[in-house]
Amino acid sequence: MKEIELDRPEEKKKKVKKEKKIGYGGKKSPEENSNFLSNLTFSWADGFVIHCFRNVLQLSHLWDLASYDKSEYLAKKIAKSWEIEIQKPKPSYLRAGFRAFGKLQLLSIFLYAISVGIQFVGPEILGRMVTFVVESKLGTSTEDPNMGYYYALIMFGTAMIGSFCTYHANRISFRTGDRLRSIIVLDVYKKAIKLSNSARSDTSPGQIVNLMSNDAQRMVEVFGMFNNGALALPQIIICLALLYKKIGWPTFVGLGLMLAAIPFNGMAAKKLTETRKYLVSLSDSRVKATNEILQAIKIIKLYAWEDSFAKKVIEHRNNEIKLLFSYSRYRTILIVIISALPTAAAILVISSYYGHEKSLDASRIFSALSYLNLLRLPLGFLPIIIALGIQMQIAGKRVTDFLLLPEMKDIQQIDNPSLPNGVYMKNSTTTWNKLKEDSFGLKNINFEATGTSLTMVVGSVGSGKSTLVQAMLGELEIIDGEIGIKGSIAYVPQQAWIINATLKENIIFGKELDEERYQKVLEVCALKRDIELFPQGDSVEIGERGINLSGGQKQRVSIARAVYSDADVYILDDPLSAVDSHVGKHLFHKCFKGILSSKTVILVANQLNYLPFADNTVVLKSGEIVERGTYYELINSKLEFSSILEKYGVDENVISKKDDIDEDEDEDQDTIEKVEIDLNKDEKSQPKSKSSNTDGTLISEEESEQGAVAGKVYWKYVTAGGGLLFLVSMIFFLLETGSKTFSDWWLSHWQTESSERMESILLGEEPTGLTDDQNLGIYIGLGMAAVFISVCKNFIYYEYSVYASRAIHHELFNALLKKPMYFFDQTPIGRIINRFTRDLDGIDNLIATSISTFLTLMLTVIATIILVSIIVPFLLIPLAPISIIFFFLQYFYRYTSRGLQRIEAITRSPIFNHFSETLNGVVSIRAYKKQQENILINQKRLDDNNNCYLTLQAMNRWLGLRLDFLANLITFFACIFITIDKDTISPANVGLALGYALSLTGNLNYAALQAADTETKMNSVERISQYIRGAVEAPQIIDDCRPSPDWPINGSIKFDNLVMRYREGLDPVLKGITCEIKAKEKIGIVGRTGAGKSSIVLALFRLIEASEGSISIDGENIAKFGLKDLRRNLAIIPQDPVLFSGTLRENLDPFNERSEEDLFSTIEDIQMSAVVKSLEGGLDSKVTENGENFSVGQRQLIVLARALLRKPKILVLDEATASVDGQSDSLIQATIRNKFSNCTILTIAHRLNTIMDSDRIMVLDAGKISEFDEPWTLLQNQNGLLTWLVDETGPQNAIYLRKLAEAKKNGIDINEIMPIDNETTPKDNINTPPPPPQ
């Protein structure tokens, strides 16, 4: 399995590049080999930045992930902590995480505390600098005249020490958060493999995906800001203490305002918590509904049910959006309160100080303002930390609850050497779900299948055959008794599980290649000829869920996997239903009775003609074994077994002979080879595999745009929420920055003017300008305006962001429903779901904050540089080279950042693809004991993703440190030029300039990082936009060309030179199909695998559009109608019955168009009224995801009921009875004959008895019509393809099929045709069953 999963197509190109040894692939990280200075300055990353500038970054260019960051190492650490935690009454996964990784985080907090302490040096130096200038102007200074230069050096040095501490602290924090994220993803994956059935039924895949994407991501986000949150309160307290030292009691006025805001913050935080809990729940429901649609998209398109299912998802989304509006408003209140606090506090503090002192001291005032500015960061982070802390707490609780769900108990392994290999069940009573009283199960089962035996399990629909299989595998909960297995198990499920890999890898399934055994397996599983027809042979990639194979091919691959595993015990759940009768015969005799003859084989089967060959037969009814024994013992009992034979319409005397058996083996093989040569005499005409590419890949590599995020992506986001609303909010962003800057400038102007007034008074001159009281009033007015503008900006902007989020989801979802079918064939579901989870969550919760923060910081930086340059003009001299260096640093960094962001996103999708695949095949994974191999695959993909993320974070630190250096240089030069110009510059302007210059250190770096972060977040919009644009199906409705309401009236169909290919550039799969089907005709369609049977259905429903030619219904070209108008007037019963979670009523009538009477009448027609009445709620009873609370046979009957309710004029049966037993098959066929007698019916069949009463049979070969006539007429051609197919079913059955064809010709009711009697005895054969006991 490990080999299979690691060789995905999206990784193949990267492996090629790895061979070229570009970059650091396969090497240790340069960080691990760096010296102290290189590590301190992140200089070890210089070479990597240059590499990213020169090359398009690939995953293979990255160095190996450090061993201490690998998920395997982290898993061991968390496992110990979690073991301790689960012993507690209220375990917490977050506590376990802190216990495992907390020590490292303490180091991060220590480093950040040093940085915080150093921040307070700046305001202190600022005050001293202002005093130095004032005293120099007055000539009263006792300090060294060069003291200003010393202050500049102290400011620069301490700021750089703070920067070093900050970035190394952040590096540790992000690493800790990523470790927690990784380990949550891994532990959730491990748990998903082990979930019990009761836990699985209550947990949807969508919920689990949300845990792995959104909830795990919260850890990274929280720990990225953990230090800011942990030290916010100490930082605020120290600021206030230093503020008190500067200005005295007015500090308490500001403190009082902050204390008054606490209750409001608390209320908003509480509301945020409550709203977030509901939001997560609604998100789970939406993702679950979306995932279900994607899993069954083909059926939804065939039924034209897009509107019904879209309504469900949009309803979920609208409920989510309502809460998102509430969440946004509470968050905005929190942001407004905290962001406005420093401005409001400054107004109160300055006003109080002036009121008390009746004058303004520049050194005190501007030091105070610097302290108040330092408060902005911890206060600004508080709402974010509170919101993220709430989300982390909820996420941690959800993860904890999930990890505490009950697990599947391993089946007892018997190691008694005296016992033969096999399955042992003693007095076993089992159930699917202990918590539900009405849960189906098995009662008091005593069963043994041991040694070299073949045991067949039979029973009617819903009797418990598959339930027995699941009990043997340990998938059911044991209420009483014992179940044990001796030996290894191989399992073939009823619906084949195929992994997204090559055909060969699907068969080998992680085991070492034994070429001889492999070739033998291909032979006995009848796969050799199929492989020859694939252009890439067994290296063809068969796609997610095996979309590149027919149902029969998928099942044969599944059987081949089991056979190749060379297990001791084989448990096969109805594997022959999906294959043609002649292939089934080959599999039974060559495989089950051939290569597996030395094994224990348990075969659930609906093909009763094989019963004489079984060593034992078990008969099930209502979850109990009612009969057991050899075939001959059972037919003499005249009990349930005889009843089943009678319902199937098989004479027990006939089946006891050589019915459905091969002719002489050599002769049979010659016949098969001869017909295959005839069928494929023109090799070039054979249809290639669906969607095959020249390199054998099927799944498309995930798109990765190169270069910067395009402007159209930003424009997409801007216009999504309403361009006018965005424009208004941008105006408020400008006004907010302008009002705050102007407010601070006015304070400087006021202090300067106040000093000049004092000088005028002292000189006896008339003072000019505004009075101090007037200046105070203007200052207060400007401050209040800034607060008001901030409130308006936040409310408008965050309202806009929710509108944008709503519009983007709707557009994405609607575009997805309109995608052509080949898009879903090429695109793994996990990748699509990633758009609806991680990417959409980013748009819902992260992009708005990221853009807002970036715009605020960018405008502040611009305002700062302009203001400082006006006050200190000489600063423009060093500012020019500094700006150039800044530009180049940012330019180089963006190449690195973009490459890493995109690879991180691309390496994330395979994690979810693999998870989705695992959930679909979890029973097979457990049966084959492949859990650990899949966990290793998950770890490898996690490590690839983590490597990208941690490298990106290192690059952020690399840039941040260098930008801080530049910002500190600006402050340094500002001090230098102020010292030079100390005799002419205003002290108030010194305070203003240095105060703003000090803020550059943090703001410049944060602005640059936020620019990169915003681009990262916009990648979510970019990836969603990729799905919004691109190929779409034809319109659902064409207003100018709609069919009449009663169309089609007759149901005639005409194919006129129809040519169809799956995609442009591929060979056609239908080649010039021309025929007419009369109204009400019953047409059977047969042909070998790849002949084009299912392609005709795809063309009729326009799932694939015709390349040439046309199809007409009642004389109307179907290409001119909308898809909805076409598909709603057709009906199909597909091979794989699909039910959706909801109610039985919704599954039958999703648009609520039928009356209660119609529904119950239809239920009676399919003979399920007793079952429905026994369900709690009847028609409104719950249907679980995938309809797992119904058997496959019952699901197919419900699908038949859907078709009955449609009352179509044209019905298509696409191998509709392939997966049901004989009784259900007979019921379905009888219902179709009776209820659809006035319909045109096209039947694609594996069981020839279902089509021998057709009016005509169409035999397809290599995409062309080989034969098309009445069954009896075709059977007169001894060299015909239909004749061969009939003969291949075995002599006895061939005679019966000919009688059916003759009866149809003579107008005799086929129900009157009894199976042939024992007068006709075919010649002896090596495969003749043993005679009955005498």
Swiss-Prot record:
CDD domains: ABC_6TM_ABCC_D1 (cd18579), ABC_6TM_MRP1_2_3_6_D2_like (cd18603), ABCC_MRP_domain1 (cd03250), ABCC_MRP_domain2 (cd03244)
Record field: compositional bias (Basic and acidic residues): 1-13, 676-686
Native source organism of the sequence: Dictyostelium discoideum
Localization in the cell: Membrane
Family, as annotated: Belongs to the ABC transporter superfamily. ABCC family. Conjugate transporter (TC 3.A.1.208) subfamily.
Gene Ontology cellular component list: membrane
Compositional bias ranges of the Polar residues kind: 688-697
Cross-referenced InterPro entries: AAA+_ATPase, ABC1_TM_dom, ABC1_TM_sf, ABC_transporter-like_ATP-bd, ABC_transporter-like_CS, ABC_transporter_C-like, ABCC_6TM_D1, P-loop_NTPase
Membrane topology field: Multi-pass membrane protein
Official protein name in the record: ABC transporter C family member 10
Keyword Transmembrane carried by entry: yes
Ranges annotated as spanning the membrane: 106-126, 147-167, 222-242, 247-267, 333-353, 370-390, 718-738, 776-796, 843-863, 865-885, 958-978, 984-1004
Region spans: Disordered: 1-26, 676-703, 1315-1334
Domain ABC transporter, first and last residues per copy: 423-647, 1053-1287
GO biological process: sorocarp development; transmembrane transport
Gene expressing this chain: abcC10
Signal peptide stretch: none
Keyword terms: ATP-binding, Membrane, Nucleotide-binding, Repeat, Transmembrane, Transmembrane helix, Transport
